[in-house]
């Protein structure tokens, strides 16, 4: 059975929409087009990577060959010709399933409606609350889910510097950091719009960040397995900025140097994922975490900032460092036309 990888970064937006007929905005479609080969870093040798039909097979083959990636590009309309295959998108949602069915791919190789319902349900940010609760709320302040503008306003006035997060969002999208609750005239409209579209907001106390990182996992046969670590920097609104590319052992040692009790906590998180997610989901999974300064000036751990039931940028950087022997920094740089795929390699210095 052949492996087929596919980049659909609009996945989080499609989850928020919920139905199978979501149309991504132009910036998301451009992002998907320009970084179409990104999963090739994660894919095992002799896999396929599905690309838009208007892209050149020859050009993408040269790009992959120049980076010593033994991956074959194939137009999405031709994936059905592969026959028996295992499809690995950036993330599964109803829209992608519908698109692949329209491309002639057998439903035997796609998740069922019930499986997609579980993915959407577990991709809700309240899953992070369940993980905190499974760990006994023993580490950092737990997010709270609020459903009215009045309750959200009360929270942000009590916690200046807090984060308001839409339930279905990722990679820093759908997040509002409230620095001045009384002087920010935009935030009330943002709250009303978010509650209207998604029904609730996850509200989090702002923490004095030391380092963002994640554990990168795969769920298979009812069990979550640790694949590696990613260390990254994010901006003011928690959007991905850059990722560190290094061997897994080096990243692990760096994190242990800042927080020596990390490994037992990761074990507890994996047990929570085994209970909460793995019985209902097979695929890639990333758990974002954060080291921060506590009120006593010590480094503390937030063991679950968010859970992503999909592939992540951290999986890309982890594979670059551990499997492909690269070291440096991974950054996606916007060009005038969008996000230039050629800049992936140029940023590894």
Predicted regions and their residues:
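N-terminal-proximal low-complexity accessory segments that begin disordered
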Residues: 1-45
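Glycine-rich phosphate-binding loop of ATP-grasp-fold ATP-dependent ligases
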Residues: 142-143, 161-187, 213-214, 236-254
């Amino acid at each position: 059975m052949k492996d087929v990888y596919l980049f659909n970064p609009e996945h989080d937006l499609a989850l928020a929409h919920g139905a199978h007929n979501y149309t991504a905005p132009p910036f998301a479609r451009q992002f998907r087009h320009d970084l179409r080969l990104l999963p090739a870093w994660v894919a095992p040798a002799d896999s396929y990577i599905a690309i838009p039909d208007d892209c050149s097979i020859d050009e993408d083959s040269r790009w992959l060959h120049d980076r010593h990636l033994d991956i074959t590009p194939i137009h999405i309309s031709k994936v059905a010709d592969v026959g028996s295959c295992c499809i690995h998108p950036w993330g599964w949602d109803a829209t992608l399933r519908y698109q692949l069915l329209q491309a002639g791919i057998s439903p035997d190789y796609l998740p069922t409606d019930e499986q997609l319902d579980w993915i959407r349900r577990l991709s809700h940010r309240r899953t992070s609350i369940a993980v905190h609760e499974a760990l006994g709320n023993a580490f950092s302040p737990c997010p709270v889910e609020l459903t009215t503008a009045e309750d959200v306003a009360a929270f942000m006035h009590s916690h200046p510097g807090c984060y308001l997060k839409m339930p279905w969002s990722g990679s820093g999208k759908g997040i509002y950091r409230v620095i001045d609750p009384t002087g920010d005239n935009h935030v009330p409209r943002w709250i009303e719009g978010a509650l209207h579209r998604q029904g609730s907001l996850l509200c989090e106390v702002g923490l004095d960040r030391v380092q963002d990182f994640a554990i990168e996992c795969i769920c298979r046969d009812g069990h979550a397995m640790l694949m590696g670590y990613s260390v990254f920097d994010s901006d003011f609104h928690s959007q991905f900025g850059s990722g560190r590319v290094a061997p897994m052992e080096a990243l692990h040692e760096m994190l242990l140097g800042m927080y020596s009790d990390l490994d037992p906590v990761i074990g507890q998180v994996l047990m929570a994922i085994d209970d909460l997610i793995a019985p209902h989901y097979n695929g890639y999974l990333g758990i974002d975490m954060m080291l921060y300064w506590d009120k006593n000036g010590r480094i503390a751990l937030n063991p679950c900032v968010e859970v992503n039931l999909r592939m992540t940028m951290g999986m890309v950087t982890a594979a670059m460092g551990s499997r492909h022997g690269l070291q440096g920094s991974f950054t996606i740089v916007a060009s005038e036309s969008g996000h230039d795929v050629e800049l992936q390699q140029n940023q590894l210095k």
